Amino acid sequence: MKPISIKDSWIGLDESGKGDYFGPLVVAGVQVDTELSARLTAWGVKDSKRLSDKRILDLEPMIRQACPHSIVAIGPERYNELYAKIQNLNKLLAWAHARTLENLLSERASPRAIADQFGDERFIKNALLEKGRQIALEQRPQAEEDPAVAAASILARAEFLKRLKRLSEEHQMDLPKGASDRVREAAVRLVRETSAEALKKVAKWHFKTTQQVLEASRPR
């Protein structure tokens, strides 16, 4: 990892798994300077939603090696515990963004950070700790257009994909991405073959999908 210019640097933050019923919520932070930003663009780094899973997994080690970064992954069980306490997805997201930023700033300084805007912009600022409060935090729509944020989206999605694969292997069944009919069918099968409690270990319980799955799983 080549040393970067701290004065000329900024941090990009993004998350993955927010809309996926199965799997964790992951937030990543990536620090770049002007030179690194140009290199990421040359590699084809862009919003992970515009890339295939294969391309995401190909780019991930390149970004990890080139850029200072931090990743906070909240597995389904922990996610469900936190949501039960916080009762607000945007506040939970803000907490994870703040932890990611604080972890990265504990290793190296940076004057500013950029994150996608979700909910009240005070959510992240209120969740920041000492180091995070000392930098300029910009929250804006479509922040993934910035190379640092795009790189963070790739690291977050790659971590999500790897953890979802491990959950699928542990439960010996395919746990699909998203929140589609296929996802509901997999969840119903899991409940019927195991229990509703098992669902809490792999899924985000507060999704409306849960009630649909539990109703469909009841004996007829």
Whereabouts are the PLM-identified features?
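RNase H-like, Mg2+-dependent phosphodiesterase core
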Residues: M1-R220
